[in-house]
Amino acid sequence: MTTIVLIWDNFGPMHDDRVRAVVKAYGKRARIVGIELFGKSDTYEWDNEANTEFEKVTLFPGMEAGSVPPLTIAARIVSRCRALKAGHVFLCNYDQTAILLAAAALRLSGRGVYTMACSKFDDLERNITREFLKRFFFLPYQGAISSGVRARDYMRLMGIPRDRIASEYNTLSIDRIRALSGQQPAPQGTPFADRHFTIVARFVPKKNLAMALDAYELYCQTAERPRALHLCGSGKLEAMLRAKAAEMGLADRVVFRGFLQSDGIAQALGHSLALILPSVEEQFGNVVIEAQAMGLPVILSDNCGARDKLVRSGVNGFVIEPDNPEGLAFFMGLLDRDEALWRRMSASAGTFAEKGDVARFAEAVQMLVPAA
């Protein structure tokens, strides 16, 4: 029986979802092990829950990225994979030195090595020479799990053959989200008139939250009874955003919820009219899956990778430019006023949710490593 190892920096709810799905898909035909490098995330405040449903190993308990030298990390990855007699290893963060070293060593030892990523060419301004040199980081990999259209194309640019790129990478358990919400997905559940707009994001520049507040101000100027805007998240821009909302006279309508764990997000979305994601840079946007699990239309920027497969403008949401607050305000007003439109989009969002379900990730793993 082969052993398949899935490695991430730190396990949050989405990683637990994915490993559980792979365990379920393979059954007794493979041993599945999840490895997290560090016991703490240096980016997210999510709960790192105790797990009893699958084998999980933490290489550096109580530590976070940046606290351990790359060579030490690589050596620990290789050592543990050898001890587990891993036949196939899936790794994230191909651009990190430790991952490159570990992937190369594992490939040279005869193991199947695969990368998992959702980077897109349009994530930032690219230098062609640098992109060509970056292909070196992909040499150890025999395949990849990616997302959408643009991320898959980027994997091809990096030298991964088209027929060795599986999808979808960015996935969550739809059942878990709905159970955590404690509510029926829209259009059932909370009445239309009682719903608010919601943004779930870190308070950092690339999330474009200042533009979202500009759009919300424009929306409030034309709405007969403006709905509240809930901001779920935390970060270095919080003080600035609070001050901006106050200066606009919107302090009583903009609700700062703080960082929410998975259950809090699911519950907030259960009372929402729509999710807003106006990022200037967004590799994917996993919260889109959470929103669709709860039947919500999504208004997001065309920079977001999730729009490739999950959002169809005018069908289950709207796509905007990240520098267009007038457009965002227009679509907010449209959903606010037109309950029939909202209900149609809500029903469509619910059907699209399956495209982001964690079962798609398990299918991707099975495409690259067929069960015996």
Task: Pin down the residues of each PLM region.
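A short, well-ordered alpha-helix in the C-terminal region of glycosyltransferases
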Residues: 334, 341-355
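Conserved acidic donor-binding segment of nucleotide-sugar-dependent glycosyltransferases
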Residues: 313-314, 318-325, 333-339
